[in-house]
């Protein structure tokens, strides 16, 4: 595979990344998603759209976000140097706003009046509510009851921003069910609404759109790292639930001699229902309108999943990630709850940066890998900040003293 031409070849015109991707939709929804795909290909490549998105990123989002060298954390581990791409400093505190502003701008150009989406940890919901307020659009966010309880600050933010938060009370009451609920609502309202998927998954064109809007993260990081150090990192890593921050981080490095590692949540362990590590334990399947690797129960349905990180507990992964693993270009590893929480507290104490629990999975892998490497450099996408998590963390883990004995 020549990765210098990869972006021109994938996805193909049908939204396929090799055997993954596509659009598996009801007859009712096919024209709605075709409308979005056609609009994306025409509107989003226009000079007017690109110019406006650049202005928004600079003036509203505060981009570019910096790359930061974790000197104290690196020193505590050894000689390998850990760097962070600080998406926690993007407006609203996570990478999610990168694609939400793009989707909101697209909706505005298309003449839609409402944004509909699901959210897990609440960061996508907050980002989309922010985009809706910015563009003067209505916003409807579907969120599982379990996540509403865990992520109360983000629920409050969404409501302050004017969004309607719809509690989802069926099934496990988490991210997968929230997607189901949002899909149902969109099916009834697609003529005046746009569905804004929260990750690099779903029916075509969303894996493509979200990847393209998020790629600003990797392009910035690549240039910034080279400017800081004079070379490329040895390893690039990011957490993977659906895979939006990872897709944005990885794409610009595909053609470079860099190891690229996605980190999935192992949760409490290997037993089905105790983790959300789709790539490690899943198999090919179709869910939520796209084909990828997914966790299945004994009946072939989406399996119950768990992660301490609400934004990672999804039983599948974006189709491009499945394809990149198949090509052998990106490897995928797992980190459990305990390892993620140790990284959460150590980054907080050593660097004064409180990370999102989702991002802590990638930091945990970087810490583990740094011990093995002994030298060189690792660049981590710190996808978000941990403000949303602190009440939950203190209730279940205290203030982290156990990690510093």
Curated annotation (Swiss-Prot):
Gene behind this protein: trpB
Lyase listed as a keyword: yes
HAMAP family: Trp_synth_beta
Glycosyltransferase among keywords: no
Subunit architecture: Tetramer of two alpha and two beta chains.
Function: The beta subunit is responsible for the synthesis of L-tryptophan from indole and L-serine.
Alphabetical keyword list: Amino-acid biosynthesis, Aromatic amino acid biosynthesis, Lyase, Pyridoxal phosphate, Tryptophan biosynthesis
Residue ranges that the Swiss-Prot or TrEMBL entry lists as coiled coil: none
The protein's name: Tryptophan synthase beta chain
GO terms under cellular component: cytoplasm
GO MF entry, a single one: tryptophan synthase activity
N6-(pyridoxal phosphate)lysine PTM positions: 96
Species in which this protein is naturally found: Clostridium botulinum (strain Alaska E43 / Type E3)
Cofactor(s) required, per the database record: pyridoxal 5'-phosphate
Top class in the EC scheme: lyase
Enzyme Commission number, as recorded: 4.2.1.20
UniProt pathway: Amino-acid biosynthesis; L-tryptophan biosynthesis; L-tryptophan from chorismate: step 5/5
